[in-house]
Regions:
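Beta1/beta-strand and adjacent pyrophosphate-binding region of the FAD-binding site
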Residues: 2-16
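Small-residue (primarily alanine) positions within well-ordered alpha-helices
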Residues: 16, 20-25
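Conserved dinucleotide-binding and phosphotransfer motif residues
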Residues: 27-29, 91, 123, 182
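Short beta-strand-to-turn element immediately C-terminal to the catalytic PLP-Schiff-base lysine
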Residues: 46, 54-56, 218, 244-245
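Glycine-rich active-site loop/strand segments that organize a redox cofactor
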Residues: 51-99
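Short beta-strand to alpha-helix junction loop
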Residues: 72-80, 99-118, 165-171, 199
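Predominantly flavin-linked oxidoreductase catalytic cores and closely associated redox partners
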Residues: 111, 118-245
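Glycine-rich FAD pyrophosphate-binding loop
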Residues: 9, 25-49
Protein backbone atom coordinates (compact mmCIF):
# COMPACT_ATOMS: atom_id res chain seq x y z
CA UNK A 1 0.00 0.00 0.00
CA UNK A 2 1.21 3.50 -0.85
CA UNK A 3 2.18 5.94 1.89
CA UNK A 4 3.48 9.25 0.55
CA UNK A 5 3.91 12.76 1.90
CA UNK A 6 3.71 16.03 -0.06
CA UNK A 7 3.66 19.76 0.55
CA UNK A 8 0.43 20.14 -1.43
CA UNK A 9 -2.20 17.61 -2.44
CA UNK A 10 -4.88 18.67 -4.91
CA UNK A 11 -8.09 16.64 -4.87
CA UNK A 12 -9.42 16.54 -8.42
CA UNK A 13 -7.63 16.36 -11.75
CA UNK A 14 -9.81 18.57 -13.89
CA UNK A 15 -8.92 21.99 -15.30
CA UNK A 16 -9.00 23.71 -11.90
CA UNK A 17 -7.06 20.93 -10.20
CA UNK A 18 -4.36 20.85 -12.86
CA UNK A 19 -3.98 24.64 -12.80
CA UNK A 20 -3.81 24.69 -8.99
CA UNK A 21 -1.19 21.94 -8.95
CA UNK A 22 0.87 23.66 -11.65
CA UNK A 23 0.96 26.95 -9.75
CA UNK A 24 1.81 25.21 -6.47
CA UNK A 25 4.63 23.24 -8.07
CA UNK A 26 5.88 26.34 -9.91
CA UNK A 27 6.38 27.91 -6.49
CA UNK A 28 8.56 25.02 -5.39
CA UNK A 29 6.00 22.88 -3.56
CA UNK A 30 6.23 19.09 -3.78
CA UNK A 31 2.79 18.53 -5.29
CA UNK A 32 0.46 15.65 -6.09
CA UNK A 33 -3.01 15.25 -7.56
CA UNK A 34 -5.48 12.63 -6.34
CA UNK A 35 -8.01 11.93 -9.07
CA UNK A 36 -10.66 9.22 -8.90
CA UNK A 37 -10.80 9.16 -12.70
CA UNK A 38 -8.44 6.88 -14.60
CA UNK A 39 -7.62 9.78 -16.96
CA UNK A 40 -7.15 13.36 -15.71
CA UNK A 41 -8.64 16.33 -17.54
CA UNK A 42 -11.31 14.22 -19.22
CA UNK A 43 -14.06 16.79 -18.67
CA UNK A 44 -11.98 19.42 -20.49
CA UNK A 45 -12.54 17.50 -23.72
CA UNK A 46 -16.29 18.20 -23.53
CA UNK A 47 -15.89 21.92 -22.84
CA UNK A 48 -17.25 24.29 -25.47
CA UNK A 49 -18.66 21.45 -27.55
CA UNK A 50 -15.21 19.93 -27.80
CA UNK A 51 -13.51 23.22 -28.70
CA UNK A 52 -12.83 24.46 -25.14
CA UNK A 53 -13.80 28.06 -24.44
CA UNK A 54 -10.98 28.35 -21.86
CA UNK A 55 -11.42 32.03 -20.96
CA UNK A 56 -13.49 35.08 -21.79
CA UNK A 57 -12.33 38.65 -22.42
CA UNK A 58 -15.61 40.03 -21.05
CA UNK A 59 -15.10 39.76 -17.31
CA UNK A 60 -16.16 41.84 -14.33
CA UNK A 61 -18.43 41.89 -11.31
CA UNK A 62 -21.56 42.34 -13.47
CA UNK A 63 -21.11 38.77 -14.74
CA UNK A 64 -21.36 37.24 -11.25
CA UNK A 65 -24.52 36.59 -9.24
CA UNK A 66 -23.95 36.64 -5.49
CA UNK A 67 -24.32 38.87 -2.43
CA UNK A 68 -20.95 40.58 -3.00
CA UNK A 69 -20.03 40.35 -6.69
CA UNK A 70 -17.16 42.82 -6.19
CA UNK A 71 -15.15 40.00 -4.58
CA UNK A 72 -14.26 38.76 -8.05
CA UNK A 73 -12.32 41.94 -8.88
CA UNK A 74 -9.47 40.98 -6.54
CA UNK A 75 -9.37 37.48 -8.03
CA UNK A 76 -9.27 38.76 -11.60
CA UNK A 77 -6.46 41.14 -10.68
CA UNK A 78 -4.43 38.15 -9.52
CA UNK A 79 -4.91 36.18 -12.75
CA UNK A 80 -6.82 37.87 -15.56
CA UNK A 81 -8.05 36.62 -18.92
CA UNK A 82 -4.93 38.12 -20.47
CA UNK A 83 -2.78 36.20 -17.98
CA UNK A 84 -4.62 33.01 -18.93
CA UNK A 85 -3.97 33.59 -22.63
CA UNK A 86 -0.29 34.30 -21.94
CA UNK A 87 -0.03 31.19 -19.77
CA UNK A 88 -1.28 28.90 -22.52
CA UNK A 89 0.77 30.71 -25.15
CA UNK A 90 3.88 29.76 -23.16
CA UNK A 91 2.66 26.17 -23.30
CA UNK A 92 2.38 26.37 -27.08
CA UNK A 93 -1.38 26.95 -27.35
CA UNK A 94 -2.32 29.87 -29.57
CA UNK A 95 -5.67 31.59 -29.04
CA UNK A 96 -8.55 32.36 -31.34
CA UNK A 97 -10.87 35.15 -30.17
CA UNK A 98 -14.52 34.83 -31.19
CA UNK A 99 -16.36 37.90 -29.91
CA UNK A 100 -14.60 37.68 -26.55
CA UNK A 101 -14.81 33.89 -26.28
CA UNK A 102 -11.30 32.45 -26.37
CA UNK A 103 -10.58 29.03 -27.89
CA UNK A 104 -7.38 27.21 -28.84
CA UNK A 105 -6.59 28.06 -32.45
CA UNK A 106 -6.68 24.36 -33.33
CA UNK A 107 -10.37 24.28 -32.37
CA UNK A 108 -9.75 21.20 -30.22
CA UNK A 109 -10.18 21.00 -26.46
CA UNK A 110 -7.47 18.34 -26.36
CA UNK A 111 -4.90 21.11 -26.99
CA UNK A 112 -5.70 22.63 -23.58
CA UNK A 113 -5.82 19.30 -21.76
CA UNK A 114 -2.58 18.02 -23.26
CA UNK A 115 -0.78 21.29 -22.55
CA UNK A 116 -1.76 21.13 -18.87
CA UNK A 117 -0.73 17.49 -18.53
CA UNK A 118 2.62 18.15 -20.22
CA UNK A 119 3.29 21.10 -17.90
CA UNK A 120 2.35 19.02 -14.86
CA UNK A 121 4.73 16.27 -15.94
CA UNK A 122 7.54 18.75 -16.57
CA UNK A 123 7.14 20.16 -13.06
CA UNK A 124 7.29 16.70 -11.54
CA UNK A 125 3.71 16.71 -10.27
CA UNK A 126 2.66 13.19 -9.31
CA UNK A 127 -0.82 12.35 -10.57
CA UNK A 128 -2.48 9.40 -8.87
CA UNK A 129 -5.42 8.23 -10.97
CA UNK A 130 -8.19 5.84 -10.00
CA UNK A 131 -7.89 6.95 -6.39
CA UNK A 132 -10.96 6.29 -4.25
CA UNK A 133 -10.78 8.62 -1.26
CA UNK A 134 -12.51 7.21 1.81
CA UNK A 135 -11.77 10.06 4.18
CA UNK A 136 -9.70 13.24 4.56
CA UNK A 137 -8.67 14.18 8.09
CA UNK A 138 -7.19 17.50 9.16
CA UNK A 139 -5.21 17.27 12.37
CA UNK A 140 -2.30 19.27 13.80
CA UNK A 141 -1.90 21.36 10.65
CA UNK A 142 -1.60 18.22 8.55
CA UNK A 143 -3.95 16.47 6.16
CA UNK A 144 -4.18 12.70 5.91
CA UNK A 145 -5.93 10.98 3.02
CA UNK A 146 -7.30 7.49 3.51
CA UNK A 147 -7.75 5.96 0.06
CA UNK A 148 -8.28 2.55 -1.50
CA UNK A 149 -4.73 2.76 -2.83
CA UNK A 150 -3.02 3.67 0.43
CA UNK A 151 -2.38 6.70 2.63
CA UNK A 152 -1.24 10.15 1.57
CA UNK A 153 -0.22 13.13 3.71
CA UNK A 154 0.24 16.84 3.05
CA UNK A 155 0.66 20.21 4.71
CA UNK A 156 -1.84 21.84 2.35
CA UNK A 157 -4.98 20.47 0.70
CA UNK A 158 -6.69 22.09 -2.29
CA UNK A 159 -10.20 20.92 -3.11
CA UNK A 160 -10.86 21.07 -6.87
CA UNK A 161 -13.58 18.48 -7.12
CA UNK A 162 -16.16 20.52 -9.01
CA UNK A 163 -19.76 20.82 -7.87
CA UNK A 164 -22.37 18.09 -8.14
CA UNK A 165 -23.87 18.71 -11.58
CA UNK A 166 -22.05 15.97 -13.47
CA UNK A 167 -21.31 12.84 -11.41
CA UNK A 168 -20.16 10.87 -14.46
CA UNK A 169 -17.36 13.36 -15.09
CA UNK A 170 -16.38 13.56 -11.43
CA UNK A 171 -18.53 16.41 -10.10
CA UNK A 172 -20.37 14.21 -7.60
CA UNK A 173 -20.62 16.60 -4.65
CA UNK A 174 -17.84 14.95 -2.62
CA UNK A 175 -16.03 18.28 -2.35
CA UNK A 176 -18.85 19.68 -0.21
CA UNK A 177 -18.48 16.78 2.21
CA UNK A 178 -14.73 17.30 2.51
CA UNK A 179 -15.16 21.06 2.97
CA UNK A 180 -17.68 20.53 5.78
CA UNK A 181 -15.33 18.11 7.51
CA UNK A 182 -12.69 20.88 7.58
CA UNK A 183 -15.15 23.23 9.31
CA UNK A 184 -16.21 25.27 6.29
CA UNK A 185 -19.78 26.49 5.93
CA UNK A 186 -21.48 25.12 2.82
CA UNK A 187 -24.75 26.56 1.59
CA UNK A 188 -27.21 24.02 0.21
CA UNK A 189 -26.37 23.54 -3.49
CA UNK A 190 -29.27 24.12 -5.85
CA UNK A 191 -29.50 23.48 -9.61
CA UNK A 192 -28.94 26.74 -11.49
CA UNK A 193 -29.07 25.73 -15.14
CA UNK A 194 -31.75 23.75 -16.92
CA UNK A 195 -33.35 23.73 -20.35
CA UNK A 196 -36.33 26.00 -20.98
CA UNK A 197 -39.11 23.83 -22.35
CA UNK A 198 -41.23 25.15 -25.22
CA UNK A 199 -43.84 23.85 -27.63
CA UNK A 200 -43.26 25.07 -31.17
CA UNK A 201 -43.40 23.06 -34.39
CA UNK A 202 -40.48 24.99 -35.92
CA UNK A 203 -38.14 23.64 -33.22
CA UNK A 204 -38.32 20.21 -34.88
CA UNK A 205 -36.97 21.70 -38.09
CA UNK A 206 -34.18 23.70 -36.45
CA UNK A 207 -32.91 21.14 -33.93
CA UNK A 208 -29.11 21.17 -33.85
CA UNK A 209 -28.82 24.42 -35.83
CA UNK A 210 -26.50 27.05 -34.32
CA UNK A 211 -27.39 30.71 -34.85
CA UNK A 212 -27.13 34.19 -33.37
CA UNK A 213 -30.20 35.29 -31.44
CA UNK A 214 -31.40 37.83 -28.90
CA UNK A 215 -32.92 36.89 -25.55
CA UNK A 216 -35.29 39.39 -23.96
CA UNK A 217 -36.73 39.34 -20.43
CA UNK A 218 -40.18 40.86 -20.01
CA UNK A 219 -41.68 41.88 -16.66
CA UNK A 220 -45.29 43.07 -16.66
CA UNK A 221 -45.15 43.56 -20.40
CA UNK A 222 -41.98 45.65 -20.39
CA UNK A 223 -38.55 44.51 -21.62
CA UNK A 224 -36.15 44.85 -18.68
CA UNK A 225 -33.15 42.99 -20.10
CA UNK A 226 -31.80 42.05 -23.51
CA UNK A 227 -28.66 40.09 -24.41
CA UNK A 228 -27.24 38.64 -27.64
CA UNK A 229 -26.49 34.91 -27.54
CA UNK A 230 -25.31 32.08 -29.73
CA UNK A 231 -27.82 29.25 -29.70
CA UNK A 232 -28.02 25.66 -30.70
CA UNK A 233 -31.72 24.93 -30.94
CA UNK A 234 -33.13 21.86 -29.17
CA UNK A 235 -36.21 19.89 -30.14
CA UNK A 236 -37.79 20.43 -26.72
CA UNK A 237 -36.88 24.09 -26.27
CA UNK A 238 -33.86 26.22 -25.52
CA UNK A 239 -30.54 25.47 -23.78
CA UNK A 240 -30.70 26.75 -20.23
CA UNK A 241 -27.03 27.67 -19.98
CA UNK A 242 -27.33 30.67 -22.28
CA UNK A 243 -30.65 31.81 -20.85
CA UNK A 244 -29.92 31.67 -17.15
CA UNK A 245 -26.34 32.91 -17.39
Amino acid sequence: MKQKTYDVIVVGGGAAGLMAAIHAASGGAHTAILDHHEVSGKKILATGNGKCNFTNLMQGESYYRCDTPAFVLHILEQFSAEDTIAFFRELGVMTRDRQGYCYPRSGQASAIRNALLRKAEKLGIEIHNGIGIRKIIRENNRFSFDTKSGSFFSTCCILATGGMASPKSGSDGSGYIYAKSFGHTVKKPLPALTALMAEANWLKETTGVRADATVKLYVDGSCVAEVPVKYRWLIMGFPGFRLFR
